[in-house]
Amino acid sequence: MTVRPQFGVGRVTRFYVPMLLQAFSQSLTYPLVAGIVTHGVYGVHELTAFAQGQMIMFMIGAFGGGLMMTGMVFATDRAGYLNFRKLNALMMAALLAAQCLPALPPFNTWVFEGGFSLSPDLAQIARETLLWGTVMNGSFFLRNVPLVVLFNNLQSGKANVATCVRIVLTVASAALFPRLGWTGAGPGLFALTLGCVVELAITWFYARPYTRELLAQPGAADADNAVSTQFRFTLPLSFGGLLLMMSPIIIAAFVSRTPQAADMLAIHYVT
């Protein structure tokens, strides 16, 4: 583990700004793909369907929203890191399985045609977006482990590089795909997923030396860093994010029953 330097406002600010970009990047990249999706067969209505699948994906992913903070608290030695990695894998498997469930019959009909009042064609787009979005959501979960290692070693700048690459790739895809005729929900999801996978690979690359150093440390698991302890710590941290992600879904359910609902839902997603 890197020896922590003396505390100072300037040093804290330099550590914080890259972390701020991590959160800001999500708000920036998702609207960028709107230009890809809206040039699909169903136009702006395709973005509406795409958005419903994405919103459910984000809500399910919010159950793991506290994992990052959990890792920064517990994954500071070998045993804590190994147990955090196990917890992250278990929660990823459970939540990705939960993400697939609403995309499978008969639940997909209940959710997208019943809950969001989408036509069968648009409901199919939303279903496929949710189902194939497991790759994107999975990359976010896998990124937790190396990202925690970088943050715990005060290397938020290196994490920032990976995030900047994701943003650049998404911007490039948003500009290039429509010119090549690659439009619609599928290419839009691919543009988002590509950036996430590349970001994951870069983050793992930067974290490798720090991970080797961490695994070389002695230490045994105990009740203070057990998987169950870390899980109980994660749940309250995730709860606030879950409530935030439920809000747009509840709003979308109301909007879907208004005149010109498809147009309004597309705007709701972008904003």
Model-derived features: positions:
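Hydrophobic alpha-helical transmembrane bundles that constitute the permease/transmembrane domains
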Residues: Y16, L20-L32, I56-T70, N137-V145, ...
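Hydrophobic/aromatic residues within transmembrane alpha-helices of membrane transport systems
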Residues: L21, V33, V37, F50, ...
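Helix-terminus/linker motif at the lipid-water interface of multi-pass membrane proteins
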Residues: S27-T48, E113-S117, L180-G181, S238, ...
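A short glycine-centered flexible hinge/capping loop motif at secondary-structure junctions
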Residues: T38-V44, F74-L82, N152-Q155, G184-A185, ...
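Residue-level recognition of membrane-helix boundary sites in multi-pass small-molecule transporters
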Residues: E46-A49, E128, G157-K158, P187, ...
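Alpha-helical transmembrane segments of multi-pass membrane transporters/permeases
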Residues: L82-R85, V149-L176, G186-L189
